[in-house]
Design a protein with these regions (language model features):
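Residues in the short beta-alpha loop(s) of Rossmann-like NAD(P)-binding domains
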Residues: 20, 159-160, 217
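NAD(P)-binding Rossmann-fold cofactor-contacting core
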Residues: 148-165
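Rossmann-like adenosine-cofactor binding region
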Residues: 164-235, 239
């Protein structure tokens, strides 16, 4: 927290904008953080909206908002409502953090920071190439980080459109051997649909593979469980969320 950040006597609000987010990590995390820091005048809301066009109404109803997190499916759609956007968020085309200062909305992407710092510690020398499952907003920060780390990748989509996208049916033994990192950027397997999982050839996985799931609830998705059963290194998205949340807090409270 910035040393110039002052605890005000009036209410200070933050929130999460998304769809179907009653289970959200953010509200619990920041409510506990406010309690630990004795910020009794701070509150965190879940803004569960069906359509991005409902976003301006949130701002009108809560003029005391100082910062917002943005989650699926609005990380791309939110951009048109912003006054400014960071260079990284502009390059990615997705925003998951908004700082509100003097009624100006400034967009950032802290997913980059969260993913890179959670993903890198388990990288091994043989992890040269990656498979990204999913092509939505969540995959954009992952692609950005992999490019930064000079890790080539292919994108897997149910409905491939671009040249660098392939189908799930294209994932064979040779690809799994060559692309030893597999990152799940789809919501498949998220609570409550915990019996679902991306359809990849898990039987071809072994101890050389590294499976990273952006999902954090449940803590072990079937994607990770099946990978672990075949000897792969696995990691869920909880630490990534914690790291990006702390980054968002620094952005919100910096002068």
């Amino acid at each position: 927290m910035d040393k110039n950040y002052e605890q005000r006597s009036q209410k200070v609000s933050f929130g999460l904008v998304g769809k179907n987010i009653p289970y959200s990590f953010s509200k619990k995390y920041f409510t506990e953080k406010f309690s630990k820091l004795n910020l009794s005048n701070h509150e965190f809301y879940n803004f569960d909206i069906d359509n991005i066009n409902q976003f301006p109404a949130i701002l009108n109803k809560h003029p005391q908002l100082k910062g917002l997190s943005v989650t699926i499916p609005y990380k791309e759609q939110i951009i048109e409502f912003l006054d400014e956007i960071s260079e990284e968020a502009k390059d990615i085309g997705a925003v998951n953090c908004i700082k509100i200062i003097n009624n100006k909305l400034i967009g950032f992407n802290t997913d980059i920071y969260g993913f890179e710092n959670s993903f890198k510690p388990l990288l091994k020398s043989n992890h040269k190439k990656a498979i990204i499952l999913g092509t939505g907003g969540a995959s954009k920060a992952v692609k950005y980080v992999l490019n930064k780390l000079s890790i080539p990748f292919v994108l897997v989509s149910r409905n491939p459109i671009l040249n660098d996208e392939i189908t799930y049916q294209s994932l064979n033994d040779d690809l799994i051997k060559e692309y030893q990192i597999i990152i799940n950027c789809t919501p498949t397997g998220t609570f409550p649909s915990i019996n679902e999982y991306p359809k990849i050839p898990y039987e071809n996985l072994n101890e050389t593979n590294y499976l990273f799931d952006l999902i954090y609830n449940p803590s072990e998705t079937l994607f990770l469980k099946k990978g672990k059963e075949n000897g792969a290194t696995v990691k869920n998205g909880l630490e990534m969320l914690e790291i990006q949340a702390e980054k968002a807090w620094k952005i919100w409270t910096s002068s």
